[in-house]
């Protein structure tokens, strides 16, 4: 909900970051990273949690430019996002809910450029606030990564739009307030 100034910004932005547990398309991220020379960091969860959340990741065959690290808690996400140049949220298209929201909103709040898969987590919500790519398309993801990595103006413009969007969304207190308001509207005849 609240990020300290130290958590928000870093002078060093030196990799492409991805993480998450629910309905992540890590194979597409890995294949996209094989097509670019930029460093990547994949923050992974316990295998049991990933499997339960329909996420598959093979850490045995990563390209040389991708490092995998095990998630050690929510603060590690903040630390890794802070040092990322780009945050990628690769999502599986076959889900009936919107995964990836917490990762992309946290990254946006930290003024990071986000690349995210088109789907329920983006449709009707995002336009200029993120770079949106087709699902299960490593070539399109690699092209977006290269474009964002090399185009400072695009990266900064998208990150600034994303930051404004994340701030408009509010936070946990706003979410709880909205839930209470909707429940009250439903209960009143």
Language-model regions, residue ranges each:
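Short beta-strand->alpha-helix junction loop in the catalytic core
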Residues: 1-4, 46-49, 180
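A short alpha->beta transition loop at the rim of the catalytic pocket in nucleotide-sugar-dependent
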Residues: 85, 107, 111-112
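Nucleotide-activated donor-binding/catalytic signature segment of Leloir-type glycosyltransferases, i.e.
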Residues: 44, 52-86
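Nucleotide-sugar-dependent
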Residues: 75, 89-105, 116-124
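Conserved donor-binding loops in enzymes that form glycosidic bonds
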Residues: 18-22, 45, 70-71, 93, ...
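Conserved donor-binding/catalytic core segment of Leloir-type glycosyltransferases
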Residues: 6-24, 30-41
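Conserved acidic donor-binding segment of nucleotide-sugar-dependent glycosyltransferases
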Residues: 128-139, 147-152
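A charged, aromatic-enriched C-terminal amphipathic alpha-helix characteristic of glycosyltransferases
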Residues: 153-184
